[in-house]
Design a protein with these regions (language model features):
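Noncatalytic, beta-rich nucleic-acid-contacting surfaces in large DNA/RNA-processing enzymes
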Residues: 1-170
Length: 170
């Protein structure tokens, strides 16, 4: 169902963007579905980043897809703890100059100019909305279960879907 792009009736997956993402990713399990859901959020997809992810097959340069990816990226970049990295992520997300400047000061001590530019380029998407891994996995499980029932018992699936879901495609 998912690999054919049959997303109609699947909560959180009915958009055209999600359909294209599912077709490109060809999810084989809940984790692939969670990745697809995270990839369509503005922070992960901005500036052709989603397309770059698909071109590289997920094996290219490190990309920030979820909030936790940003935390790990920041922690690795300046060698700080995860809680400090989360503070910096939130600072970039909310565009708090004092927190961003504190991070930049730490970054200048640890990295060269080219590395600094690459790190800041990745973090510039932080103010846009992204999923945390927990939300991505939870919704991934939901969509996976719905797709299972859509394939296994379509009549019961559609009866329940039309009764309980308020889809824009109704």
């Amino acid at each position: 169902v998912l690999c054919r792009g049959e997303v109609l009736g699947l909560t959180q997956s009915e958009s055209r963007t999600m359909r294209k993402t599912v077709l490109a990713l060809q999810p084989k399990n809940v984790y692939d579905m969670a990745l697809a859901l995270a990839l369509i959020r503005p922070a992960a997809a901005d500036g052709g980043r989603k397309a770059a992810y698909f071109r590289s097959g997920g094996k290219g340069k490190r990309q920030i897809i979820t909030d936790e990816d940003a935390i790990e990226y920041i922690s690795d970049s300046i060698g700080c703890s995860m809680d400090f990295a989360d503070k910096y992520r939130r600072g970039f997300s909310k565009q708090i100059p004092s927190v961003m400047n504190e991070f930049l000061f730490s970054l200048k001590d640890k990295r060269g100019n080219i590395e600094q530019a690459d790190i800041l380029k990745e973090l510039k998407h932080s103010p846009k909305y992204s999923y945390c891994r927990g939300h991505s996995l939870s919704y991934g499980q939901l969509v996976w279960a719905l797709a299972y029932w859509k394939a296994r018992d379509p009549q019961r699936f559609w009866r329940a879907t039309t009764k309980h879901c308020h889809s824009s495609y109704r």
